């Protein structure tokens, strides 16, 4: 699938023409879709930054100390079996 040099030059000229005219998108929908995409990417990057900050800053170097839990009996006493 070879691309001819004429097609490549036409594409380059089209891109350069859009850059010179400051018309990057063809329609309003293209602009809206790009803004939604940037918002999504910003949200994902913010969440990743928060996860990294939580992992790096909030973890203690020593082992965790958990309070000893009381032993609870499992199950239910069947009072009908008692004399």
Swiss-Prot record:
Induction: Up-regulated in breast cancer. Residues 63-75 have a biased composition (Basic and acidic residues). InterPro entries: SIM_Modulators, SMIM5/18/22. Residues 60-83 are annotated as: Disordered. GO terms for cellular component: late endosome; membrane. It is found in: Membrane; Late endosome. This is Small integral membrane protein 22. The gene is SMIM22. Interacts with CANX and DDOST. Interacts with SQLE; this interaction modulates lipid droplet formation. The lineage of its organism: Eukaryota, Metazoa, Chordata, Craniata, Vertebrata. Its main location: membrane.
């Amino acid at each position: 699938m070879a691309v001819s040099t004429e097609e490549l030059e036409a594409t380059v000229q089209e891109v350069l023409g859009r850059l010179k005219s400051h018309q990057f998108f063809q329609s309003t929908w293209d602009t809206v879709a790009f803004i939604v995409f940037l918002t999504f990417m910003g949200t994902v990057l913010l969440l990743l930054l928060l996860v990294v900050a939580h992992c790096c800053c909030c973890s203690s170097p020593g082992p965790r100390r958990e309070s000893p839990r009381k032993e609870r009996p499992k199950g239910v006493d069947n009072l009908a079996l008692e004399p």
